[in-house]
Amino acid sequence: MALKSYKPTTPGQRGLVLIDRSELWKGRPVKSLTEGLTKSGGRNNTGRITSRRRGGGAKRLYRIVDFKRNKFDVAATVERIEYDPNRTAFIALVKYEDGEQAYILAPQRLAVGDKVIASAKADIKPGNAMPFSGMPIGTIVHNIEMKPGKGGQIARAAGTYAQFVGRDGGYAQIRLSSGELRLVRQECMATVGAVSNPDNSNQNYGKAGRMRHKGKRPSVRGVVMNPIDHPHGGGEGRTSGGRHPVTPWGKPTKGKRTRNTNKASQKLIIRSRHAKKKGR
């Protein structure tokens, strides 16, 4: 979908660039496929902030999206494409031949009336899901499982995709948009195509209030805090911090690797996403 830019009739309109969602469904979601969603405000079960800069925002209903695509060999027709406030991608309402309805992630170039199917070996059309064992090499895919039957976890955000580049001893090699090359089991499901709404990253919300509507609060720099609140805090006048950039808890930030190298999935990463960086 295209981007909409606005004339600066007010300060909040100046620089505003939003996604044109005029072609999406304008009604409410299917009630049987929605749940209530309680806001956490970034707090955990003890009431402490574990994820900063969250809180407020408009109320949402959670749409139950089918990431597993495990209803095999039953064709489904796309009824409509909908907006989902809980993710950057759009979602598609599909109706199976047996009458069941489900929400799936809408890939690019999926239109109302299209047929989609999940099968052991399906046509290479956007929205069709199949395991890597039945897929030709070179296919662009999204919503990729990391464990068979667990549901898609990789390449679910707007505009993302991965490329199936090879097979190796029961594993499929996929190249992610970050540049990472990794292995997943051939039994893992993936959906053909790239995720919808590729222009999402080109939006400019124009004013802080629009981010507050999305539930995002201001990000305060450590250098303007007091010493009790941040390692960069304190000092008379403006100071540069006096040490390498760290988080509020003293851990190095801005590029420091934090991934645990003892993770079980570490051996499935053939080429790190950092390998392309100079001097690394």
Swiss-Prot record:
Family matches, as PROSITE patterns: RIBOSOMAL_L2
* Ribonucleoprotein found in the keyword field: yes
Residue spans of biased composition, Basic residues class? 209-219
Q: Which InterPro entries match?
A: NA-bd_OB-fold, Rib_uL2_dom2, Ribosomal_uL2, Ribosomal_uL2_bac/org-type, Ribosomal_uL2_C, Ribosomal_uL2_CS, Ribosomal_uL2_dom3, Ribosomal_uL2_RNA-bd_dom
For the region Disordered, what residue ranges are annotated? Answer: 33-55, 199-266
Q: Name one GO biological process term.
A: cytoplasmic translation
Which branch of life, at top level?
Bacteria
* Gene Ontology MF terms: rRNA binding; structural constituent of ribosome; transferase activity
The UniProt entry's GO CC annotations, sorted and at most eight, read: large ribosomal subunit
In terms of Pfam families, this protein maps to:
Ribosomal_L2, Ribosomal_L2_C
Function of the protein: One of the primary rRNA binding proteins. Required for association of the 30S and 50S subunits to form the 70S ribosome, for tRNA binding and peptide bond formation. It has been suggested to have peptidyltransferase activity; this is somewhat controversial. Makes several contacts with the 16S rRNA in the 70S ribosome.
Protein family according to the UniProt entry: Belongs to the universal ribosomal protein uL2 family.
Self-association state and partner proteins as the record states: Part of the 50S ribosomal subunit. Forms a bridge to the 30S subunit in the 70S ribosome.
**What protein is this chain from?**
Large ribosomal subunit protein uL2
* Species whose genome carries this gene: Ruegeria sp. (strain TM1040)
